[in-house]
């Protein structure tokens, strides 16, 4: 499952959504750096956490809306259920994931809320430093 998710994840779009209005304020180099950080963050924290807490994953349904899709799954772990939906779109002829919705909460929008608060309180540079440090902690 991890390979399927990582291999089909649109980290740039996820990063754009997560950074919101601050994305356009960043240079191309900063955008690429942030996308790399978000890739590491997603792989090392979110996906690892999901995989650790997953005994069985059930694919419940798909909703196709033109060039977008929503794939609904249920992850079971030690008797508890977590609903994980994958928001997907066609990019370059391939279906790619750009967001995960865990028990009704969008990961990208939750990131955006936290990132806006951090940038407003400190700075974009501090957000990047913290994300890098937290990603290194999990390796």
List the model feature ranges, each with a label:
Residues 1-46:
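Early exported N-terminus immediately downstream of N-terminal targeting peptides
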Residues 1-3, 7-9, 14-15, 46, ...:
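Short leucine-rich amphipathic alpha-helices used at interfaces
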Residues 3-14, 74-77, 91, 137:
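Intrinsically disordered, low-complexity linear regions
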Residues 20-22, 51-57, 117-119:
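Juxtamembrane/interface motifs at transmembrane-helix termini
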Residues 31, 49, 60-64, 121, ...:
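Alpha-helix boundary/capping detector
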Residues 43-82, 134-139:
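Surface-exposed, charged secondary-structure patches
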Residues 81-109:
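Short beta-strand edge/turn micro-motifs at domain boundaries
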Residues 102-139:
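Low-complexity, intrinsically disordered terminal/linker segments enriched in charged
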